[in-house]
């Protein structure tokens, strides 16, 4: 839950800055849930393709983020908006795309954080008491760095989707431009999260050593 707080706060901020009409709760909730569903599809696709890049070492990891993770995750989050909210008459302004994009990103981030923490928290830590708190806290902090990125870049792509809705003559190029911008920024966010992961992991190891001493 704590790992999602920054993403929730950012999504709430995007919602509050909508200077047009307030978006209906039904569309916001539906978009959030679709963001959760599309996250599962992205997770499967990422898992299938990752081994092909793993053989290339660090270069493969970078390529994987830019060629697969960014485009796939930003596309499915935009799909979460396109499937329902976009088709509703209440999606009646360009900035609505930003709000719904942020909600799709929030849904994606929440389920991704939950899956990541469940997978990464070692089963052996369950018997260690304070060790569990330390490990869980470290992972939570790492995921807290990643969550806002999903909201930000999904909101950017959503803005372009809003532009596309009201510029039917250039709809395709506008949507592609938005996805490309978000897909390029996303791996940069992942790299930042990776640096944070290393720092937090090092702090946790040092703390454990200090307790032992």
Where are the predicted features?
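Hydrophobic alpha-helical segments at protein termini of multi-pass membrane proteins
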Residues: 1-213
């Amino acid at each position: 839950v704590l790992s999602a707080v920054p993403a929730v706060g950012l999504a709430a901020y995007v919602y509050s800055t909508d200077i047009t009409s307030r978006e209906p709760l039904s569309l916001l909730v539906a978009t959030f849930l679709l963001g959760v569903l599309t996250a599962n599809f992205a997770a499967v696709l990422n898992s299938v393709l990752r081994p092909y890049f793993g053989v290339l070492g660090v270069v493969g990891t970078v390529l994987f983020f830019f060629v697969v993770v960014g485009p796939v995750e930003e596309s499915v989050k935009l799909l979460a908006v396109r499937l329902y909210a976009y088709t509703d008459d209440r999606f009646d302004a360009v900035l609505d795309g930003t709000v719904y994009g942020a909600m799709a990103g929030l849904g994606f981030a929440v389920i991704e954080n939950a899956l990541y923490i469940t997978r990464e928290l070692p089963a052996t830590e369950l018997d260690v008491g304070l060790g569990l708190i330390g490990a869980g806290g470290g992972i939570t902090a790492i995921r807290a760095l990643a969550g806002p990125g999903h909201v930000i870049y999904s909101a950017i792509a959503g803005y372009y989707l809003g532009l596309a809705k009201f510029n039917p003559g250039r709809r395709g190029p506008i949507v592609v431009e938005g996805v490309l911008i978000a897909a390029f920024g996303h791996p940069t966010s992942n790299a930042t999260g990776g640096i944070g992961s290393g720092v937090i992991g090092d702090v946790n190891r040092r703390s454990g050593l200090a307790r032992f001493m």
